[in-house]
Amino acid sequence: MSTHKKKTRKLRGHVSHGHGRIGKHRKHPGGRGNAGGMHHHRINFDKYHPGYFGKLGMRNYHLRRNSKWAPAINLDKLWTLVSEQTRSKYQNHPEGKAPVIDIVKAGYYKLLGKGACLTNLSLLKPSFSLNRLEDKIKAVGGACVLSA
């Protein structure tokens, strides 16, 4: 527990509490917050916040952001999404089990078919993927399930 007195306690008995007598400590002399940016605080706003007031350009009300944003990953890079432990666990699995890879969870929304699929894997496939890619995975003994 702090034992030092607060300033208000120290100033008991001193009439003006350190705010002078003639100028006086008034409540909000310049207004609250950003008040007066166009008037009595104009110099500060023009100097340190240019462009704060006014409009620029046209407003698009129905803007669809990131409609074309779909990061892609190739088939030959799929195993980089799996940790080293999981890779070694499923490498020579006696029952031929394979890890399930969710590429959407890893941040990719498009799967491309470059490269070869060397071992079987279960894949949660995104909506952007190629048919020949599915054939490559099934040829090795894997499975593709549509996720999104």
Curated annotation (Swiss-Prot):
Disulfide bonds: none annotated. One of its GO terms (cellular component) is cytosolic large ribosomal subunit. Residues 1-37 are annotated as: Disordered. InterPro entries: Ribosomal_uL15/eL18, Ribosomal_uL15/eL18_sf. The keyword Ribonucleoprotein applies. The keyword Cell cycle does not apply. Residues 1-30 have a biased composition (Basic residues). SUPFAM superfamilies: Ribosomal proteins L15p and L18e (SSF52080). This is Large ribosomal subunit protein uL15. It comes from Tenebrio molitor. The gene is RpL27A.
